Design a protein with these regions (language model features):
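Conserved acidic, metal-coordinating active-site core of Asp-based
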Residues: 1-104, 108, 113
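Mg2+-dependent phosphoryl-transfer enzymes with acidic/Ser/Thr/Gly-rich catalytic loops
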Residues: 77-159
């Protein structure tokens, strides 16, 4: 990941996210002009009210080979074309020979996965636009969204 600060978010907030990613081994920091020639994802840390402006700017640049997608209130990610959670879910299904899939997600980057799932849910605290397109709206993440979804799936499977 490349973590880029945009707008008025505090340096401390950016540093905390960076440190979390570095502890997880999925982030490296580079000085300007350094960095890999190939990358997997760029994470822009943006105040939520500025996400539309930053997205419009990125799209105006007509980037070749990647697209912007929001993954959190503060995160706008640039990911390679053709890469999505939906594609990843299908690859896992095929590798394991699964005929059905269930998925839960709360942001725009989860949409391709939710669209392909046989059963899907969004937490109450998730994106309101996604909530309109799913089978279930479950409790918030903080209150056990995944457990709520599993209980609902169990009810469907035992009917």
């Amino acid at each position: 990941y490349w973590v880029i600060r945009w707008g008025d978010e505090s340096i401390e907030g950016v540093a905390q996210r960076r440190d979390m990613y570095m502890r997880e081994g999925c982030c490296r920091m580079y000085s300007e002009g350094e960095g890999p020639k190939r990358w997997h994802k760029v994470v822009l840390i943006v105040p939520p009210e500025q996400i539309p402006t930053v997205r419009a700017y990125v799209e105006e640049q007509n980037p070749q080979g990647f697209y912007p997608v929001q993954s959190d209130a503060f995160y706008l990610e640039l990911v390679p074309q053709g890469i999505s959670k939906g594609r990843g879910m299908r690859m896992i299904q095929q590798a394991l020979g699964l005929t059905k899939a269930a998925a839960i997600g709360d942001r725009e980057n989860d949409k391709p996965m939710l669209e392909l799932a046989d059963f899907c849910a969004v937490p109450k605290s998730g994106d309101p636009d996604l909530q309109k397109e799913v089978d279930f709206i479950v409790d918030s993440c903080e209150n056990g969204a995944v457990a709520d979804f599993i209980c609902r799936l169990e009810q469907i499977c035992t009917q």
